[in-house]
C-alpha cells in the first residue's frame, strides 16, 4: 500500500512539473495589442498613428500606466460613447504624454502637451468629448498638431484598407 501511495505521489509530482505541452509551445508568448489607425489632418499635413484602444473601464483606468516608452506613431485611444466630460491624470505613468480631447465633430477641443509623469492633477477639456487620444509627449508639437485639427479612425481614417473593427469614427466634413 505504501508503495502504491509513493507511486501516486511521484506521478502527481511528475505531472505538475512536466514541460509545456506542444500546444503551449506553439502559442505566441504574448500577442501584441491590436491597433487601430488614426489620421489627424492638420495645417502641416496628414499624420497617421496606429494606436491601442482602451475599450473597457478597466483598460481605460490603466491606460498607458507603467509603460517605459511609446512609439512615435503609437498611442492609445479612449473612446467615449456616449460622449462625456473626461478627466485624466498621470498617476503611475512613467513617460510624458500629449492628451488630445476630441469633439464629436472630430476636431481637437483641447490639447494638453507633455503631461507630467506621476502627476495627480486632473486634465480635462471641461466639456463632453467623443474620445481622448494619448500620444508620446511632444509629438503633437513636432508634427504641428493643434486644437481645431481633425481626426478620424478605423475604416474612416484609411478607407482603402480593410479594417475589421466596430470602432469607425467618421466626422462630418468641416463646414
Please place each PLM-identified region on the residue numbering.
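C-terminal motif of bacterial Sec signal peptides marking the signal peptidase cleavage site
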Residues: 13-15
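Compact, glycine-rich, soluble single-domain proteins
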Residues: 17-175
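Residue-level signal for mature regions of secreted extracellular proteins and peptides
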Residues: 9-10, 163
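Sec-dependent signal peptide recognition
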Residues: 2-9
Amino acid at each position: 500500500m505504501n508503495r502504491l501511495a509513493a507511486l501516486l505521489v511521484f506521478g502527481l509530482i511528475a505531472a505538475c512539473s512536466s514541460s509545456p505541452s506542444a500546444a503551449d509551445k506553439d502559442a505566441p508568448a504574448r500577442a501584441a495589442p491590436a491597433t487601430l489607425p488614426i489620421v489627424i489632418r492638420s495645417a502641416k499635413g496628414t499624420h497617421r498613428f496606429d494606436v491601442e484602444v482602451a475599450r473597457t473601464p478597466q483598460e481605460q483606468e490603466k491606460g498607458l500606466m507603467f509603460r517605459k516608452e511609446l512609439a512615435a506613431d503609437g498611442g492609445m485611444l479612449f473612446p467615449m460613447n456616449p460622449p462625456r466630460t473626461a478627466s485624466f491624470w498621470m498617476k503611475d505613468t512613467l513617460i510624458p504624454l500629449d492628451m488630445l480631447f476630441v469633439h464629436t465633430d472630430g476636431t481637437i477641443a483641447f490639447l494638453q502637451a507633455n503631461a507630467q509623469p506621476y502627476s495627480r492633477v486632473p486634465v480635462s477639456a471641461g466639456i463632453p468629448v467623443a474620445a481622448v487620444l494619448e500620444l508620446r509627449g511632444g509629438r503633437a508639437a513636432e508634427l504641428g498638431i493643434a486644437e481645431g485639427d481633425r481626426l478620424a479612425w478605423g475604416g474612416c481614417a484609411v478607407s482603402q484598407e480593410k479594417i475589421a473593427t466596430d470602432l469607425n469614427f467618421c466626422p462630418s466634413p468641416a463646414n
